Amino acid sequence: NRTVPVVILTGHLGAGKTTVLNHLLRHPGLRAGVIINDFGAINVDAALVQGQIDEVASVSGGCLCCLDDASQLDEALDALSHPKLALDALIIEASGLAEPGTLARLVWLSPVTHIRLSSVVDIVDAKRHFDTVDLGGVPPRRYGVASLVVINRIDELTAQERVGQVVRIEARIRQRNPRATIIHTRH
């Protein structure tokens, strides 16, 4: 009765989700299944990761958290978590439009019995974050759902920008979620 951990990978459009996913998939010995949610009919992200993963499923036609029902997601979770595949983990790469909390609830409430929600990883674009995701006021809800926040693209900031911008992003995350683990990465 083994359950397969599900990791939800979220982030705004262009934050670096596919880059982070590709990095994870290169980890030797990891047998992962990936569910990719591309917004639209052409699955660009699916093409980018083909050949690097053990099993893949794509859910298209809209943002996972906005679909009329979760049956496509449930079917993908069920197929990829089948015991015969013996995968170590399932990774859902969400559309940049996805609401992390809604997506986490869909996995949590899924009727698929051999999965468990492991974590929500939110990818943040250090350079464009305050122009795209966090526009001020109350910190975005997405921070509250994430168990891990990856502040990505810090290499695109000058040393001076890095100090101010990263500290500001971390402070906003901590306002909403003091327990989140925060790491920095280069694109």
List PLM regions with ranges.
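Flexible active-site lid/hinge loop adjacent to a nucleotide/diphosphate
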Residues: 133-145, 149-151
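C-terminal accessory "lid"/substrate-recognition subdomains
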Residues: 148, 156-187
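Nucleotide-state-sensitive switch-loop elements of NTP-binding domains
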Residues: 1-10, 15-132
